[in-house]
Amino acid sequence: LKYIKMNQSNEDFEIPVPWFLIKHPEGDVVIDGGNAIEVAIDKHAHWGAVVNAYDPVMKKSDNCVEQAKSVGTNISDVRYLIQSHLHLDHSGGVGRFPNAIHVVQRLEYDYAFNPDWFAAPAYIRKDFDKPNIHWKYLNDKKTDFFDLYGDGVITIIFSPGHSPGHQS
C-alpha cells in the first residue's frame, strides 16, 4: 500500500502504511502486513464508515502477499508474522502466510476484540478473527525483549501507547 488519505483538515494528507519482510537464515519474518487486500477490492464493504476518515489508496497488487512474491519469497516459507498491533492498517497479513506463527502481545489481542468506543474503528475484527491461525502470545513485561530466533537479530519490545498491547 502506498498510503492512506485522511480528511481531518481542509486538505487531504497521506500516511504511509509500511510492512516489512526480513530474510533470516532460520526463516522469513513479516512485520505487520499493511492493509488487507479486501480494501483494494471494496474498501466500503471491508472497512465500512472508517473510509470517511481513512481512505485506503491501494491496488490489489500492493498487498503484502503479492509484494513478498514479487521479490522471490515463497509465502509458505514465512515462519513468523509479527504484529506490532492489530489496527486496520497493520493487520492485512494475518492468515495470509499459511505456515506462519503470528506473534502478538496477549494484551493487544484481547483488547482488539473489545476496544473502547474511541479505538473501536481502528480494529477490523474480520482481519484477525480467523480460524486456523497459529498465535504466539507475548505477555507484556514478562516477555519483554523477546529474542525471536535467539540470535539477537530480531528482538520484540513491549511498547504500549499507540495501542494497549503495542510492540516494537
Q: What does each model-found stretch correspond to?
A:
Residues 41-42, 94-96, 114-115:
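Short, solvent-exposed loop/turn and secondary-structure capping segments
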Residues 46-104:
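Active-site metal-binding motif and surrounding structural segment of the metallo-beta-lactamase
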Residues 30-33, 79-85, 104-105, 157-161:
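Active-site neighborhood of phospho(di)ester-bond hydrolases with catalytic His/Asp-centered motifs
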Residues 9-13, 157-162:
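Short Gly/Pro-enriched turn/cap motifs at secondary-structure boundaries
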Residues 2-66, 168:
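Conserved beta-strand hairpin/beta-sheet module of binuclear metal-dependent hydrolase folds
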Residues 14-18, 98, 131, 144, ...:
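Residues that flank catalytic or metal-binding motifs in active/ligand-binding sites
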Residues 35, 88, 165:
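Short, glycine/acidic-enriched loop or turn micro-motifs at the edges of active sites
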Residues 55-77, 105-158:
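Metallo-beta-lactamase
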